[in-house]
Amino acid sequence: MQTPVSVNEKKDFIRWFLNHYQLKRRECVWILNYLMSHDSLMEKVHFVEQAEFCPRGIIMSTHCVEEVPFRFYKENVMTTDAEKSFHDIRLNKQQDLFIQLNFRSAYSSPEYAAVLESNPHIPKNLFENKKDQGLAEQILEHAISTFQREKLLKDIDDALDRHDKEAFEQLSRQLNQLT
């Protein structure tokens, strides 16, 4: 569905997220900051929907939504103890970690769309209506494309402001490849 999300893109998103939203549990902030401080862990982080279906999934919610504050799933066992999940993350650094973030306007956020990956662990029969699933994927692809284009245009403007010809040319090539 999309190209892999880079470690830097994930870190940029987490920084943006923490600057714009307040999580219901402070331990969630600790976990996200811990993940950001270790590139090897960030390579294993995947932002997804419906993390409860994943072998190792975390659900975190902000104050602006009604969803549960925190849940950690590991092989069909669920806990609300953030310290246990933090311990598991530290001990199992080589395992993929799937994170679902519940926050206001998540589905209209281009920042979130840019790092959101399809969840390979969702049961096939969960999506009864394939037409809706296809439409949702098209909307997500469009949001990602729009976000990438806007980010490149901003970076090009910044390069022009700095009179950085090399960065301008490289970013322009990237923009041309998008279109």
UniProtKB/Swiss-Prot annotation:
Source organism: Bacillus subtilis (strain 168)
Name of the coding gene: ypiB
InterPro entries: IDEAL_dom, UPF0302, UPF0302_N, UPF0302_N_sf, Virus_scaffolding_prot_C
Positions of transmembrane segments: none
Family: Belongs to the UPF0302 family.
Protein name from the UniProt record: UPF0302 protein YpiB
